[in-house]
């Protein structure tokens, strides 16, 4: 056989977009979305291979910032779920909304204390935040 380490590696961009750190009192939520329409972006049917991720900062139940970033791992090989989970953790995400995650990405986020909230695919991001009780 080819051995364990000969499979495709996930795509790793050397130029990940910088994003400001979370300030105290702010909850940062992330959600995979299909199109970059800010708070109106629909939740994607897939997690790790969604074309975009929306990062939402919420303070006191009010949305204070929304940014939709392209998912640089969407076209990667195997192991994309782990790469996306690590990327979200590096952004300071504490809540993930969206469809079911793969077992490895889910385990990594749970170990890091990230709350995972199921969200119906196609639901606008703002509505999903309200349903989850975040905003």
What do these predicted regions represent?
Residues 1-27, 49, 54, 73-84, ...:
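Extracellular/periplasmic low-complexity linear segments
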Residues 24-78:
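Mobile, glycine- and charge-enriched loop segments
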Residues 33, 99-100, 121:
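Short secondary-structure boundary segments
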Residues 40-44, 66, 108, 121, ...:
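Short, well-ordered secondary-structure micro-motifs
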Residues 61, 91, 103-126:
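Short acidic, glycine/proline-enriched helix-loop-strand junctions
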Residues 66-95, 114:
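Compact, charge-rich alpha-helical regulatory domains located at protein termini
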Residues 75, 101-104:
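Short Gly/Pro-enriched loop/turn and capping motifs at secondary-structure junctions
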């Amino acid at each position: 056989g080819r051995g364990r380490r000969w499979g495709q590696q996930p795509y790793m961009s050397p130029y990940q977009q910088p994003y400001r750190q979370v300030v105290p009192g702010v909850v940062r939520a992330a959600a995979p979305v299909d199109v970059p329409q800010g708070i109106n972006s629909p939740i994607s049917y897939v997690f790790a291979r969604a074309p975009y991720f929306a990062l939402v900062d919420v303070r006191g139940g009010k949305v204070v910032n929304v940014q939709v970033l392209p998912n640089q791992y969407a076209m990667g090989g195997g192991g994309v779920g782990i790469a996306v989970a690590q990327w979200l953790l590096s952004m300071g995400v504490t809540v993930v909304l969206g469809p079911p995650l793969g077992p490895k990405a889910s385990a990594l986020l749970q170990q890091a204390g990230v709350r995972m909230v199921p969200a119906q695919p196609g639901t606008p991001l703002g509505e999903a935040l309200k349903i989850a009780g975040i905003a």
